[in-house]
C-alpha cells in the first residue's frame, strides 16, 4: 500500500490545530490509507494517549508515537510485522528526538511547538514501513 506523504502531512497539520498528537497521527495515517474506521472511533481510540497519557505531560510516551503504533497495527495484517515495525517506529523516533517521553519533548506541556513536526516525522516512517 502506497501512502501519499504530501496528503498525509497536510491531514496531520490540519488535525493538529485542534486535536492531540495521538489523534492527529492515527487519523492522518488511517485516512490517507483509506482504512475503514470512523473519525469518531479513531478519536475515542487515541484520545487517552494524548499529552503523554491522559494529558499528564509526565513520563508517558509521546502521542505521536502511540498514534503511529496504533495505525501500524491497523494498517498491517501480519502480527510479527506489526511487532517488528513497532520496534523500528519507537527506535527511529527516539533516535531523532533523543526520547519518546512527552514531558521531555514539550517541557512538561509548556512548549508544544515541536509536536506537529514529531507527528509528521513518525507518520512518514509508518508510511515507509507500510509501503515495504
Q: Where are each of the predicted segments found?
A:
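DPxDG-like acidic metal-binding loop motif
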Residues: 66-75
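Phosphate-handling active-site elements
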Residues: 33-44, 74-88
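A short glycine/serine-rich beta->alpha loop
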Residues: 8-16, 50-59, 107-111
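C-terminal binding/interaction regions
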Residues: 2-3, 82-132
Amino acid at each position: 500500500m502506497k501512502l501519499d506523504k504530501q496528503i498525509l502531512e497536510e491531514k496531520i497539520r490540519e488535525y493538529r490545530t485542534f486535536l492531540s498528537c495521538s489523534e492527529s497521527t492515527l487519523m492522518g495515517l488511517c485516512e490517507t490509507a483509506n482504512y475503514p474506521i470512523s473519525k469518531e472511533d479513531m478519536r475515542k481510540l487515541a484520545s487517552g494517549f494524548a499529552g503523554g497519557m491522559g494529558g499528564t505531560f509526565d513520563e508517558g510516551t509521546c502521542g505521536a508515537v502511540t498514534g503511529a503504533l496504533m495505525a501500524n497495527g491497523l494498517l498491517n495484517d501480519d502480527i510479527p510485522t506489526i511487532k517488528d515495525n513497532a520496534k523500528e517506529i519507537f527506535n527511529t523516533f527516539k533516535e531523532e528526538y533523543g526520547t519518546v517521553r512527552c514531558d521531555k519533548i514539550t517541557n512538561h506541556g509548556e512548549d508544544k511547538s515541536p509536536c506537529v513536526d514529531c507527528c509528521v516525522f513518525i507518520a512518514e516512517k509508518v508510511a515507509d514501513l507500510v509501503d515495504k
